[in-house]
Amino acid sequence: MTRSTDTLRGLATRAIHDGQHPDPTTGAVVPPIYQTSTFVQDGVNQFREGGHEYSRGSNPTRNGFEEQLASLEHGTRAFAFSSGMAAEDALLRAVLQPGDHVVLAADVYGGTFRLVDRVLSGWGISHSIVPSASADDAARTVRPGSTAVLWLETPSNPLLRVADIAAWARVADDAGALLVVDNTFATPALQNPLTLGAHAVAHSTTKYIGGHSDVLGGAVVVRDAHWRGETLAERLAFQQFACGAVAGPFDAFLAARGLKTLPLRMERHCSNALEVAHFLRSREDVVEVHYPGLEDHPQHDLAAQTLHGGFGGIISFRPAGGVRAAHEFVAASELYNLSVSLGGVESLACVPHTMTHASRVGTAYEVPEDLVRLSVGLESIDDHLADLDRALGAASRVGRRDVPSVGGARQQAA
């Protein structure tokens, strides 16, 4: 759905109003959920207002959410899918063909790596991994004539590396390739990759956009760009309709409702996370903290330039006691529920090595076994700090007790 052309209004105003117009028939302030599979025609191929025929092709609830998200990302069109991985799969299949080469930043989400490494490789798509977030390293990884996509996640999952999107975009342009940025962690409340030169943005709307851990979804937002004789929007629209992994009306409604409060929620996620990061940094029983809001983060200055309004709600750290201490910490915490996924109002913790990045185990890009990822929620900051203090205290005494398992390689989610 094409977004509003009014880009002068503030982020919070657009989040609430773009694509979310009162119902013209009843005057309902909140647009209704069009929970329907098909639409009545007044005659053969004579469609009513909106041109809706079948909900796989278009649905007013989904289209409204797509317009809303496109506005926040400063894109020309957005496309909503049934999951973040469905969105990534649709985007890559829309632009790639056998013989193409994909460049992946080292710290991309494990599911993205698995999709490219184990699924697309069977269709003649090769890939290389950049050993860092550096655009110079990305340029050296490009294969002239065959590299079609550069895929970047910034801040990255789970090590919170920050990349220079504009520099990566120049590398992509020089290679005649597309730059895709996974903006799930930053969200359009903090970062707009399309304005920095990216061609497309991918989201797991399950995370901060939905924001309440009650919906599964994904989205792709594109700017006005052409690829192999068609616009990116045309390619994505065909892929969405032809393959059908669309967001259902109720899921689109939940995502749209979450998006309305995204700017406000991200303020609290960011402020809580910054305090938690400083708290962890001050502890002798924590040996490493990854958060771009910390001044000693290697890309702090870059993060301050590219992220506006905060540094995000995700932190990762390594306790002094190693993997057993990491397992004890997540078992002992009462506020941070042990779970995959992130971005909800409630706080979550996980051990990425076996819970979210198991596809990396045994590779050069395996994440540390003792790394703990925190999705810092909206609870009172005093409760965060008290709970972390208790859980870290338990982790420091890990040698006195058995440590429960937190999962195995079978798990692989956000």
What are these regions (language model features)?
Residues L254-L264, G312-A320, R373-G377:
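Short, well-ordered beta-strand elements within core beta-sheets of diverse protein domains
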Residues L274-E334, L338-V340, S359-T363, R400-G407:
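Conserved small-domain helix->loop->beta segment predominantly found in fold-type I
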Residues T2-T7, P24, A78-D285, H290, ...:
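Conserved PLP-enzyme active-site core in the AAT-like
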Residues D117, S126, A331, S347-A414:
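PLP-dependent enzyme catalytic core of the Aspartate aminotransferase-like
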Residues M1-G51, V289, R400-A414:
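N-terminal glycine-rich, Lys/His-bearing helix-loop that initiates the first secondary-structure elements
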Residues T38-D89, G111-R118:
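Conserved N-terminal alpha-helix of the aminotransferase class I/II PLP-enzyme fold
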Residues T38-F39, V222-W227, L259, P319-G322, ...:
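Short loop segments at secondary-structure junctions
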